[in-house]
Amino acid sequence: MSTTTQNIPWYRHLNRAQWRAFSAAWLGYLLDGFDFVLIALVLTEVQGEFGLTTVQAASLISAAFISRWFGGLMLGAMGDRYGRRLAMVTSIVLFSAGTLACGFAPGYITMFIARLVIGMGMAGEYGSSATYVIESWPKHLRNKASGFLISGFSVGAVVAAQVYSLVVPVWGWRALFFIGILPIIFALWLRKNIPEAEDWKEKHGGKAPVRTMVDILYRGEHRIANIVMTLAAATALWFCFAGNLQNAAIVAVLGLLCAAIFISFMVQSTGKRWPTGVMLMVVVLFAFLYSWPIQALLPTYLKTDLAYDPHTVANVLFFSGFGAAVGCCVGGFLGDWLGTRKAYVCSLLASQLLIIPVFAIGGANVWVLGLLLFFQQMLGQGIAGILPKLIGGYFDTDQRAAGLGFTYNVGALGGALAPIIGALIAQRLDLGTALASLSFSLTFVVILLIGLDMPSRVQRWLRPEALRTHDAIDGKPFSGAVPFGSAKNNLVKTKS
């Protein structure tokens, strides 16, 4: 940017079309967050009506994560070939239909399947909305674009908590899911009123359709084997999370099978850059493992361990969700100022100071608990708002939506594991201690993975000929792309 441009307030760098694109995507993400967290709010009610164990109830949260990898792949490929806008609309219709089906579910299996549909739609919404907004905004504002967008999910969670306190005590838990059909109306408006992303139009205007990840995996020479592996992964995940397997060794074998399948898909679709893709999946996996025990089981902790009534639960969740939303926006500013990776690490380190006090204070003072949760979620969860920007920078425009959607949503299986791990640990410890221990320990893993730029570092170690040295979204250098102590290591000193 020139000095003159730098003196202009950041928001004036955006025209009306760019703001409209952002507003539409943000509202879509708000509705996504609203629909997705409903199950966490009514988990105890559903558990009681269906007669579920704690682990079975937690698996209803996990179900949406099981299908996300496939939804991210398919809807991401749709976004790469036909445009980000169509993928956004399709995603909203999917998760809205799944939410409505939850309201009619007669039992556990039906609700589990409906949650699978929600997961597919959520995955598509994440990948398509993130790439849509990031590619529509100027390069120097793309951390803000990412952070501001993801704040919509947290705002949706806040709205859901408030609606829960008004609806469920009067009409019951099913009424909450019936409201989830409303986003379909919004999807119809989106289809006619928002422009296509600028980067995608420039790349594909007047050109033949790109060869997407779906083309490579399901229309190429290995299509039969890949279809079989897809069915195998889906079956393995079903048994892991809904099959009530008691043998840890069998679960471990099925988990390793899924990991091998996902790595195979990444190798086929990204070629020599597979080490980067695999490490991005690992980063996201641990990001979900540290954050989603709290996201998924906080309402249960408030209602059971602290014995809060629905109104008090809604108030505390307001602080938590609003803190995460504010953190997404703050993370966007920090990312554009410090650089994406440095902002991520600093924010997570600060959040570590608060995680133990949140669960040590107990329930005597609701306001103090709410304030602690606000700041902990602002620093620990909110910084994930710039994760789409971080991941998207490793992929070219041709495969960005599918690449972001697939890597993020395979890693998001950590969100499926997280509530179940939390519930299992809570069988030996109290739930608050289990949540604090998981979050505190696993956050350090994410700090190391992102701080050391392990995707670039592992790419350099294994396939250096395909190493990308600069972020494909904002053009800034990757710190892990250069050996430490190299004459070219001035990249490390540059914001990245």
Swiss-Prot record:
Q: How does it sit in the membrane?
A: Multi-pass membrane protein
Q: Name one GO cellular component term.
A: plasma membrane
Q: Which Cys-Cys disulfides exist here?
A: none
What PROSITE patterns does the database record attribute to this sequence? MFS (PS50850)
The UniProt keyword set, sorted, is: Cell inner membrane, Cell membrane, Membrane, Sugar transport, Transmembrane, Transmembrane helix, Transport
This protein's record includes keyword Cell membrane: yes
User: Any coiled-coil ranges, and where?
Assistant: none
Matches recorded under InterPro entries = MFS (IPR011701), MFS_dom (IPR020846), MFS_trans_sf (IPR036259), SA_transporter (IPR004742)
Q: Which PANTHER family match?
A: CARBOXYLIC ACID TRANSPORTER PROTEIN HOMOLOG, SIALIC ACID TRANSPORTER NANT
- Protein name, per record: Sialic acid transporter NanT
According to its UniProt entry, this protein's organism is: Escherichia coli O6:K15:H31 (strain 536 / UPEC)
